[in-house]
Amino acid sequence: MAFKVVVSDSKTGKSYQFETESTALIGKKIGDEISGSVVELEGYKLKITGGSDKCGFAMRHDIHGAMKMRVLLKSGPGYNVKEKGLRRRKSLRGNTISKDITLINTKVVEYGSAPLGGEPESIE
């Protein structure tokens, strides 16, 4: 299973996309810190901020586990409120990375010696 890992650099405001076949990411949760060596960024430390599964359902930090659930939402990730007081039931993925996750969003917490550099790869 291949993961697309998007690394966001808060200093420059740019994002970089990498692909990895690593199974070291399975079982990690939103908020966990991982080594940048998973995506060939030696010396970097990355924090998992979210992701989505193969069907496009977003991960949510307050749903524990790796399963997909239909939850009633009034705000937050996975739902944009159109009117005040409006609630809606949405399908979302839990906060744990499993084999069904295809996209993982991360941000840089600790920088390595080499610059991130290069242009972000386009998603096709």
From Swiss-Prot:
Q: Does the keyword Ribosomal protein apply?
A: yes
Q: Name the UniProt key words of this record, in alphabetical order.
A: Ribonucleoprotein, Ribosomal protein
Q: Which GO terms describe its cellular component?
A: ribonucleoprotein complex; ribosome
Q: Which InterPro entries does UniProt cross-reference here?
A: Ribosomal_eS6, Ribosomal_eS6_arc
Enumerate the GO terms in the molecular function aspect. Answer: structural constituent of ribosome
Please name one Pfam family that this protein belongs to: Ribosomal_S6e
Instruction: Report the SMART domains cross-referenced here.
Output: Ribosomal_S6e
As for family, the record states: Belongs to the eukaryotic ribosomal protein eS6 family.
- Name-wise, this protein is Small ribosomal subunit protein eS6
What species is given as this protein's source? Methanococcus maripaludis (strain C5 / ATCC BAA-1333)
